[in-house]
Amino acid sequence: LRKNRISYIFQGLELFGDLTAMDNILLKNRITGYKTHEEIIEMAEVLHVTSSLHKKCRILSFGQQQRVAILRALCQPFQFLFADECFSHIDRRNGEAAMELITRECAGQKAGLVVTSLGNSQEGFHEKIVL
């Protein structure tokens, strides 16, 4: 069920600290084969984490780790994406980029999105979501 229908951005991120950001992303993508390497790089550029892809996750800031977790969650087909506090440590510019990417991916898959605790920094996000 989780492989093809549900994707999740965990509040605790659930990244492997001793693996690079790219290795964490590829763990999911190797199972599904959903995204090409080029697509992953393009999404990393959108989220401004290309320079972090070959660094171990344990040395990244929490905001960078959140963006890596978002990328990992988007590397599979899904009918629903659950995002638990996935913007809490992301600045406004990167938060807007993440919202646009998530919105684009959900619309492309005609998927539903459930987001918890948006707070003020993502005001208006619900208006952009395609369910």
Locate predicted features.
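Catalytic "switch" loops of ABC-type ATPases
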Residues: 11-16, 118-119
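Q-loop/switch helix immediately C-terminal to the Walker
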Residues: 12, 19-31
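Conserved ABC ATPase signature
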Residues: 56-60, 64
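Catalytic Walker B motif of ABC-type/P-loop ATPase nucleotide-binding domains
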Residues: 81-84
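Conserved ABC ATPase "signature" region
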Residues: 37-52
